[in-house]
Amino acid sequence: MILVTGATGIVGSHIVIELLKAGEKVRVLHRKSANFIALAQLLKFHQMPDSVHYVEGDISDPVSLSEALAGCVQVYHCAAMVSFHPSDARQLHETNVIGTDNVVNACLKENVKLVYISSTATIGDVPINGERTEESPWVSDKGKSDYTLSKRYAELEVFRGMQEGLDVTIVNPGVILGPGNWGTSSTTIFLSGLKGLTFYPSGSNGFVDARDVAELAISLSKKENVQGKHLLIGENLTFKDFFTRFHELFGSKKPSVAIPKAPVMSIVNALSILEKLRLSPLKMTSENLKSAYRKMVYSNQKMVDIGYSFRTVNEALLYTNEVYKLRNNA
């Protein structure tokens, strides 16, 4: 039996599908309020019966974690909170850091292998030969978002478990492209691209297909002597190039007008003050705006060296759209 946390999300739901394809018995730990739209639509898309064993519980509750792990040989820890609102700092810490600490301790106690879905947010600040790699040094916590710090501290808990003898695999995906609970997480980027954008920021980021993340998380966990982080990046693209793909594939509005950085940073400064006072009128945060202008480039050489060939961003978008159309017609 294999346990998956966070199976309601993009990565977790895809890992469940890949495990079921491989004939594994899968148990899913979920909160009472869990929404399984993402997993249900994938099961429908792949024409697979729902043979998942669902167990109600929470990673914040060590007792329910221990009960969920009973009889399991492995856990894929995908559950995490993503938010860039300063008001969510405490919840980010409780979910991402304390929750992961609980998972690590439960795995140590039950002698269960752990596969941890981390993030590029934990990759160090200093590029090596123009790219951020698994070896890029982390210079400082200063200026980092609460989300970034929560993922870093969570990952440190995983490394702590490793030092205590836990068998661990860590993957660090970029912006994950794939079907999920529409209107949440990175599906918002897909829906925005499908609608089309005229204006675009000057930043860039690394993108990866959710299927690649699931396949690599599973395959890496089966390898001997797998150490450290593993960046999962299909392509590095500017946001202009990324949203242009939607125009080329689906006929969406083509991004054609660059938004200058200077006036946006003025908005960022004002928004930061309002956020501290909890008076911000916008859903978009100052951190969202800042990230739109960061030029992030990541290396996938570690995965290329083991022979893995990533899907392209175009393949990821076409796949996501196929599932999206199925959901609309459901």
Describe the predicted segments one by one.
Residues G143-T169:
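Active-site Tyr-X1-5-Lys
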Residues L216-K283, D305, V313-N314, L318-A330:
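Mid/C-terminal beta-alpha module of Rossmann-like enzyme folds, strongest
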